[in-house]
């Protein structure tokens, strides 16, 4: 997890025009979170789930911030919505540990990302919710949020 230790995932940025600051996830952190969720969603769509609980040691992040799983196996035998829910619960814990390892204080998580983690940890996820998980607003890069906001205001 050297990437997480060398690159802060939770950053403090100024509010333009004021002396105030707020906490947000770096764009690479949101990309990592979305990539890991997309991997799970892809495997679940194929009717497969993780055969063992996901751990921090199962996540590999390259020097450029690309993320993937390592030393994990997926199985179709016994696939159920409960297995899908378990995979996302474990992903939620792994994402929190990644942020902590990068020096981030969980108390400073932005509200949208906190809600995303709550969504992952809920025990009532349905298969249709996977679309909402991988496209959650907390996983959008800041430039996409600005574009949406500006186009909404001016058009």
Model-predicted segments: where are they?
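Phosphate/adenylate-binding glycine loop and adjacent helical scaffold
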Residues: 137
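Conserved structural core of kinase catalytic domains
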Residues: 1-31
